[in-house]
A protein has these predicted regions:
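Short, highly charged, low-complexity non-transmembrane loops/tails of multi-pass membrane proteins
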Residues: 311-325
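C-terminal ends of transmembrane helices
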Residues: 82-95, 167-179, 235, 307
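Membrane helical hairpin/interfacial module
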Residues: 46-118
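Membrane-helix cytosolic exit motif
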Residues: 298-315
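N-terminal signal-anchor module of multipass membrane proteins
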Residues: 1-59, 305, 310
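Membrane-interfacial segments
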Residues: 56, 88-92, 175, 207-208, ...
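Long, contiguous internal "core" modules enriched in hydrophobic/ aromatic residues
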Residues: 28-31, 35-42, 54-59, 102-105, ...
Length: 325
């Protein structure tokens, strides 16, 4: 006599994750921050490039001081004031500055202060007011021709480099927004800043009657080529990652015309081609330098603004479990 046929219990299907909250578009970072990022990049970049290429003497002197350095300090100061404005309250700014161990805003703000202070000290011996050079006895000069001057210049250059890169690191470092959490964001901002700065230096050469050399043109073209490569890498990799997928969809649909028309074509590819043409045809350099500045600044600013405006917090999903009785 046979007993009942035992039944085999099928293993329970693993619980499936369900969506708890969709991707949410961020609204805190916008126009002020894009302007701040742009000013910091250009302000630090023109000092860095002019000094490394030893062009500061050929970009004009006013009251015994290098004009390019004065422009750099003014742009950085404007960016710093905008940072304070964007944070809303002075005390909030102070709290942000006092966290260098965890905050790139704090590190960048400190670098801003060091840059302006040491850069200002570097050029101070050249100050001439009414024919008097009250600080000429200092053991260095604005052109860093002494050992102490070169040390001051070196620290100022290091601070300028941090000023250029920290805006991108603010976004990329531990960001909850997926589109920003990539090395490509600070890399884009750096190459864009260097391109805008190189074009600015070329314009200042034109205004001062200093010939633009082929080196400046080739550097501008290389910065833009590297920028284009990094942007391309960023938009074609990890396209399905939660948060980034929504960002790319918004970038291509809502801002597709600005992104492809202004950032990529007019702001990157066109000035890159103009820079190559200027390198090969010297008589065109002055005019093409002006055009390159207008195009790179428009493209660079919009690159930063669109990067902010397509930032999504990723969707949240989870598994609901019913406790066993």
């Amino acid at each position: 006599m046979s007993g009942p046929v035992p039944t085999t219990r099928q293993p329970a299907a693993p619980p499936r994750a369900i969506a708890l909250m969709p991707a949410v578009l961020q609204h805190e970072w916008d126009l002020y921050h894009a302007t701040w990022f742009t000013l910091m990049g250009v302000g630090g970049g023109i000092f860095l490039l002019a000094r490394l290429l030893r062009l500061e003497r050929g970009l004009g002197v006013w009251l015994g001081l290098p004009v390019v350095d004065l422009v750099s300090f003014a742009v950085i100061s404007a960016g710093g004031l905008l940072l304070i404005w964007s944070l809303g309250r002075p005390l909030r700014f102070l709290r942000a500055v006092l966290k260098p161990g965890t905050s790139w805003i704090s590190r960048g703000a400190i670098a801003d202060f060091i840059f302006v202070a040491l850069g200002g000290a570097l050029i101070l011996p050249g100050l001439a007011l009414g024919g008097a050079t009250s600080f000429a006895r200092l053991p260095w000069d604005p052109w860093a021709s002494t050992t102490l001057g070169r040390v001051i210049e070196g620290v100022a250059l290091a601070a300028a480099a941090i000023v250029i890169v920290y805006a991108g690191l603010v976004l990329a470092d531990k960001a909850a927004v997926t589109f920003w959490r990539s090395w490509a964001i600070p890399a884009q901002f750096v190459f864009s800043s260097l391109a805008m700065s190189m074009a600015t230096v070329m314009l200042m050469q034109t205004l001062d009657g200093t010939p633009i050399e082929s080196l400046e043109c080739w550097l501008l073209a290389k910065f833009l080529a590297l920028l284009l490569a990094v942007i391309a890498w960023h938009v074609v990799t990890r396209r399905t990652q939660p948060g980034k997928a929504e960002a790319l969809a918004r970038l291509h649909t809502v801002y597709g015309g600005l992104f492809w028309g202004v950032v990529i074509t007019a702001g990157t590819v066109l000035p890159m081609l103009l820079a190559v043409l200027a390198a090969l045809v010297p008589p065109t350099r002055d005019a093409l330098g002006v055009a390159a500045l207008l195009l790179t600044v428009a493209g660079g600013f919009l690159l930063r603004l669109l990067t902010l405006r397509v930032g999504y917090f990723p969707p949240v999903s989870g598994v609901l479990r019913v406790p066993k009785r």
